[in-house]
Amino acid sequence: MKIFGKEKEDKPVKEESLIDYKYSEDRILKELAEYINSTYNQHYSQNKFQATEFILDSGHGTGFTIGNILKYAQRYGKKGSREDARKDLLKVIHYGIIALHNHDKEKI
């Protein structure tokens, strides 16, 4: 099992990129993976289930994730430091990933 750049046993996975990214996508994707991994160590994820799981399972995932994307996008640059604004963008992307996961699981 790979966890973005590493196998589960913490053996490095060889990452070779022949693409000359113009917008630092490779660096940003690595940072995004580190951010997402860090959210799994936060206090609200220490329980057996996260609140997000209940929301998705109850059929409210699309509204929840899109609502959070809008919330953090509108908050961008208006709260805290420049680094706080950057974290808001990471949250937008993370909720976008959860929205994609939910979209793929829905059977509409």
Please annotate each region the language model reported.
Residues M1-I108:
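Intrinsically disordered, low-complexity regulatory regions
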